[in-house]
Amino acid sequence: MSAPRKVRLPSVKAVDMSMEDMAARLARLESENKALKQQVLRGGACASSTSVPSAPVPPPEPLTARQREVMITQATGRLASQAMKKIEDKVRKSVDGVTTRNEMENILQNLTLRIQVSMLGAKGQPSPGEGTRLRESNDPNATRRARSRSRGREAKKVQISD
């Protein structure tokens, strides 16, 4: 535990002050206290904290050319993956209910899409409305099935003898 902070007050003799002087001094100190509290709430520095040295802030780490290229490649991959998912979703929605090849070709030839991708949605958290792709759903008619156990091998049965 740290020791309580000592505050030095100017030497004032209570005997020499009249009641009016003490009331005036109290009012002045209360207004100073209020002003200091507001300054602290606003994030301003008070006189006592400016004398305390703060920890030095380390300079930003320099970025090498290789690190820069790696970061660019990672960002591009994340954004491209997110864009591909969104494009697939929009294409599937636009051709939903199409039954003939001519209809499908006509829709795909005239298809225009606008998508928006951001790094916020690319970090693994799906953005709102994302993650509802057909093959990710629990629909039995989905294009992919859930992984199942191998049917070719039987599970080994272990017997423990006493």
Swiss-Prot record:
Domain of life assignment: Viruses
Region (Disordered) location: 121-162
Pfam family, any one: Herpes_BLRF2
GO biological process, one term: symbiont-mediated suppression of host innate immune response
Cellular component GO terms held in the UniProt record: host cell cytoplasm; viral tegument
Ranges annotated as biased composition (Basic and acidic residues): 151-162
Main localisation: virion
Subcellular location: Virion tegument; Host cytoplasm
Keywords: Coiled coil, DNA-binding, Host cytoplasm, Host-virus interaction, Inhibition of host innate immune response by virus, Late protein, Viral immunoevasion, Virion, Virion tegument
Molecular functions per Gene Ontology: DNA binding
Coiled coil: 12-43
Keyword set includes Translocase: no
UniProt entry tagged with the keyword Nucleotide-binding: no
Physiological role: Plays a role in the inhibition of host innate immune system by targeting the CGAS enzymatic activity which is the principal cytosolic DNA sensor that detects invading viral DNA. Acts by inhibiting CGAS-DNA phase separation: directly binds double-stranded DNA (dsDNA) in a length dependent but sequence independent manner and is able to form DNA-induced phase separation in infected cells. DNA phase separation of ORF52 mediates disruption of liquid-like droplets in which CGAS is activated, thereby preventing CGAS activity.
Similarity comment text for this entry: Belongs to the herpesviridae BLRF2 family.
Subunit field text: Homooligomer; homooligomerizes and binds double-stranded DNA (dsDNA) cooperatively. Interacts with host CGAS.
Protein name listed in UniProt: Tegument protein BLRF2
Lineage, highest ranks first: Viruses, Duplodnaviria, Heunggongvirae, Peploviricota, Herviviricetes
